[in-house]
Amino acid sequence: VTLLFRSNAYMRIEGSLIAKGTLEAPICFRGNRMDYMFPNQPYDRISGQWQGIIIGRRCIGVDMDFCDIHSGSYGLFFEGTDASETSPLMTIRNSIIHNMSGHGIEAHNSHLHIGNSQITNAGGNCISIYGGKHEFIHCTIGQFYPFSALSGPALYLANSYSGTFCPLYQADFINCIITGYSDDDIIGESIGDDDETHPFRYRFSHCLLNTPEVVDPLFINNVWESKEHKVMHENNFTGFIPPSLIYGFQLDSLSSAIGI
């Protein structure tokens, strides 16, 4: 199943969204242009071809499996509900969110469970989290956006938005790859230093991380990318053909992510 969107079109969800494809036949959300900008670059590989998917405040649940969302202005925008730990669960599995001119995922006071998925290449941040409760397991979060040198990090975490406090109750990243072209692809900003009154809770376990190494008990058995590694950043992956805007995120056999 392929859903085609015109340049200013978007999907807004205020009830629930259930989209379940298969490995052989994923559900695809993309722009409607079938022509080429250049002989080796179809418009489908150019970001900003449509808007994206908005998960509204009244949404009661998202269940997406084997979905491919690509080449929009944003991927998934979660408006969120109240700043509590009881927000409706939004589940995404075995899916790709790729090549957005803005953020790949932007979540406000939401409850996300994302597993075995790829969130890559964004003109903004691949993932922007403002408060809420989140778990990412077996995910590749890669920032190799080709259309701007000013793109954001792969991952941005905060417990405030435009001066408004948004408690970050949980942000767990387990067996994930978080990398990109820059020297630091994980940025966190917290207001307040009291965990009870201003929660800013995160955990990284058994991940490959492109960020300066820190001593922190909430970073557990991770591999830190450094210049000592023969294979790092984009070389972790096979299938990158930038002139044709093709980005395959299958792991290279020499990647430091193998075995973590």
Where would I find each of the regions flagged by the language model?
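Beta-strand/loop edge motif enriched in small/polar residues
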Residues: V1-I260
